[in-house]
Amino acid sequence: MKKFGLLACAALFLFLTGCTEDPAPETRVTPTPGRVQVEITALPTATPVPTPTPLFLPRDDKGNLDINQDLENSLEPTSFPLAADTVILLYHTHGEEAFRQEKGYTYKETGESTYKTLETDKSILALGRLLQQELKGMGYTVLHDETDCEPPDIYSAYSRSLQVMEKYPQATVFIDLHRNAANVKEKKDDVVLLDGKRCAKMFFVVGTGIGTRPGEYDIAPDWQQNYLLAKSMTEKLREADPELCGDIRLKVGRYNQHMSPYCMLVELGHNANTFADAANTIPYLARAIGVVLPLLPAEDAP
């Protein structure tokens, strides 16, 4: 009787506590009559969510980006027909930029920097006048604003050139004409020969507006559209000479390109080029605009 009582107590203890020396079954419980069969299976494995490929990747710590190659390949150069009454605004965020001085081309420097002048017939403004003249001869309506946006601080010049753009609500195409940065230390023949003339090289800058910190810009540009415009221009210019137009510079900045999907920031020549080199490139730039942004006949305007 005592032995039976001890066994019964032990069985009751094991039942209540679930303690047992035998390992628990790993996959299946043997069916018992009158009881529900329970099958133990592994939990389903979550399907990993693929990380989307970014549209661009940092190239360096200077704000340069590399565009996603698949996106780059999908952007086929094209043309963007414009209504006959489209207004183009030509302006200069850095309007004091000038070129290498030589006989017949000298100027008084601003004192703030070499290769800069307030003499508008010697600065990048003079090239803007040439481009305006070329485009007007092709039938375009072109406004050329010569406001000096650099003073008092070049680092805030884009805030002032934005004010210039906002003065012309009728404009839909914006061209910000620059000379590339003054960092070439020696005279060099960095030109291409076209029709027997020395022509300065050029390239386009496109701003993504992602900024260097969250919330830096309240409105981001349609950078893919502006990139496609720049790519179409680049390909057209390279038909004249493969080296005439360099690769597009994709940047983290905005460069006021949120104002329109038809914004072009043009870097024409550099400080070691002559003014004549840069002036010789203007007709090729104008012709490329004529092909990529053709004017529709007035009766075909949307």
Give residue ranges: language-model regions.
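Positively charged n-region of N-terminal signal peptides that target proteins for export
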Residues: M1-G5
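N-terminal catalytic or cofactor-binding beta/alpha core of small enzyme domains
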Residues: V29-T172, R179-D190, A279, P283, ...
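Active-site-adjacent substrate-binding region
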Residues: D222-R249
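Bacterial signal peptide processing site
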Residues: T20-D22
